[in-house]
Each structure stands twice: as structure tokens, then as C-alpha cells.
């Protein structure tokens, strides 16, 4: 599996990147200068949606902000209430219906660029929200690489 590198769309640490946090949610960044390709479709979660460098992005032109959207193939990291509290030990990949209600609520950190077909067929857990109830149900991740670290073919 290959994971796309973070782009300038996302901001992970408020103090490091100087971005703003809205209502204790995932940091957003100024939308200006992103090279945003807007989609014509209406969206119930943001005034506009589209892509920046292949990443699904939502934006609010009125507020001048943009954020990564929770779409199929996006990689997220669980966190506590503080927007910069994720340590990366709780990762997930969106493999079904896009949970857009998680936009700006749970941190997105990248996207799967190769291998999503293997992730999407893994059995779901039997616990609440599809979590695995027993450690033996979990599928180990044997390798994850940043796309930037993979030699060109």
C-alpha cells in the first residue's frame, strides 16, 4: 500500500503551522493560493468541494478557508479533543460511505494511492461502529510507505 504525502492543504499542529482552529475542530488553512479545482456538484457539508493536487478538499469561500474532506481512500488519525493531540497510533482509512460529518472533527493525514482494493475487502469488526472486538480479528499492517519514498517506475 502507498500513502500520499501531506500537502499544504492540511495542517497538523496549530503552533507549528500557524493555522486557526474553529470550535476545537481540525485545523483549517487559508484557501487562497491552493490551486483548487472546484466540482460543480452541490455538497451538504461545505459550500464548495473539489481537489487540490489529487486530494479531496472542501472550502468555504466566504470564510476563506479550506480543509481535507473525509472521502473514500482518505487516511485519518484518531485524536483527543485538542486539534493537535493525535500521535498517529490510531489510524483508519475510509473504505465505505464517505463520513463527511467527520470533516474538521477528526484529523485527516493523507490518502491511499495504491492498494485501496485490499483494504476495502477486509472484514468489518462485529463491535459497535465496525470495531474489532478481539485482537485476533485484527488484520496486521505489514508495510506503509510514503509515495514520495517509493522509487519511480
Where in this protein do the model-derived segments appear?
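Cross-family detector of peptidyl-prolyl cis-trans isomerase
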Residues: 1-153
Amino acid at each position: 500500500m502507498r500513502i500520499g504525502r501531506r500537502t499544504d492543504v492540511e495542517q497538523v499542529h496549530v503552533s507549528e503551522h500557524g493555522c486557526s482552529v474553529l470550535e476545537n475542530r481540525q485545523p483549517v488553512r487559508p484557501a487562497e493560493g491552493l490551486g483548487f479545482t472546484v466540482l460543480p456538484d452541490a455538497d451538504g457539508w461545505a459550500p464548495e468541494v473539489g481537489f487540490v493536487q489529487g486530494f479531496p478538499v472542501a472550502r468555504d469561500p466566504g470564510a476563506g478557508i479550506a480543509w481535507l474532506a473525509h472521502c473514500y481512500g482518505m487516511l485519518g488519525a484518531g485524536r483527543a479533543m485538542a486539534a493537535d493531540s493525535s500521535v498517529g497510533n490510531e489510524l483508519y482509512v475510509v473504505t465505505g460511505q464517505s463520513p463527511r460529518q467527520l470533516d474538521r472533527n477528526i484529523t485527516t493525514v493523507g490518502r491511499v494511492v495504491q492498494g485501496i482494493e485490499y483494504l476495502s475487502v477486509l472484514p468489518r469488526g462485529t463491535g459497535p461502529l465496525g470495531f474489532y472486538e478481539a485482537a485476533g480479528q485484527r488484520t496486521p499492517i505489514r508495510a506503509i510507505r510514503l509515495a514520495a519514498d517509493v522509487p519511480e517506475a
